Amino acid sequence: MSAQDLSPSRRSIPEPRAMLELIKPVTWFPPMWAYLCGAVSSNVPIWENKGVVVLGIVLAGPIVCGMSQAANDWCDRHVDAINEPHRPIPSGRIPGLWGLYIAIAMSLLSLVVGWQLGSWGFVATLLGVAAAWAYSVEPIRLKRSGWWGPGLVGLAYEGLPWITGAAVLLATADTSPGFPIVMMATLYALGAHGIMTINDFKAIEGDRKLGIKSLPAVYGPEVAAKIACTVMGLAQALVITMLYLFSKPYHATAVLVLLCGQFWAMSVWMRDPEGKAPWYNGTGVVMYVSGMMITAFAIRGFTV
């Protein structure tokens, strides 16, 4: 490793605040929420299994998601030096190889905690950790692709935690997730491709310089925003259709109302795709994840 790979800093140990910033608490919500959606959709009493639920939520958010952020920031330190030089690693607040050490330590911690959730929890954790490194690290680095990268993150952030939350609770009843749970989790995970694309709007300049083919970098902000909106909209349209087919008209209508709200937010976002991407994250995405919980309640205990 060359000297250029190390953060220029006179510090020998990381700043405590910088370590918290490195694992980005703001990113923990989606997998925590998805795990809770899975627990709800299982129709297994949550209060009676609150220990498993809380442990799974902590694993999905602060531990696995936090680990993925640390790994991504370490592997992205050259990009961040261009786009966001104030971040912990390029700024030197986390010096030397400390970013890598933190990511590795949290990977091991993830597996230890995942083991406490049984075979379902451990295998899911193993997949989540593998996905995090596959997304960021060379030579795999799936984030170089604007299609594979967001798709992998969507599955890891939404689909995998949802199915895991349901599977861990259902294991207490000696059963496993059925088709409705797997299908709805998968649809929302596929739709999350659009949500993950939104996050790429803040790094267009650096992505282009370093050859990362995110959708905004390759197609431009306007086309990328249209792709993201289409993906999110189609996934939810399929969810709504299936809920009607499952004879859950009230839940389907509620998700439809939220989708209409997203269409309004999308129209606002499209006026300035690059500038309003953070705004859409705080409006349209909130409606998207609200629909996830409505869907979870709709399919709890439902079999086909």
Curated annotation (Swiss-Prot):
Any single GO CC term annotated in Swiss-Prot or TrEMBL for this entry: plasma membrane
CDD domains xrefs: PT_UbiA_chlorophyll
InterPro entries, per database record: Chl_synth (IPR006372), Prenyltransferase_related (IPR050475), UbiA_prenyltransferase (IPR000537), UbiA_sf (IPR044878)
Localisation: Cell membrane
Pathway(s) where this gene product acts: Porphyrin-containing compound metabolism; bacteriochlorophyll biosynthesis (light-independent)
Keywords: Bacteriochlorophyll biosynthesis, Cell membrane, Chlorophyll biosynthesis, Membrane, Photosynthesis, Transmembrane, Transmembrane helix
Membrane topology: Multi-pass membrane protein
Chief localisation class: membrane
Main function: Catalyzes the esterification of bacteriochlorophyllide a by geranylgeraniol-PPi.
Protein name according to UniProt: Bacteriochlorophyll synthase 33 kDa chain
Protein species of origin: Rhodobacter capsulatus (strain ATCC BAA-309 / NBRC 16581 / SB1003)
Source lineage: Bacteria, Pseudomonadati, Pseudomonadota, Alphaproteobacteria, Rhodobacterales
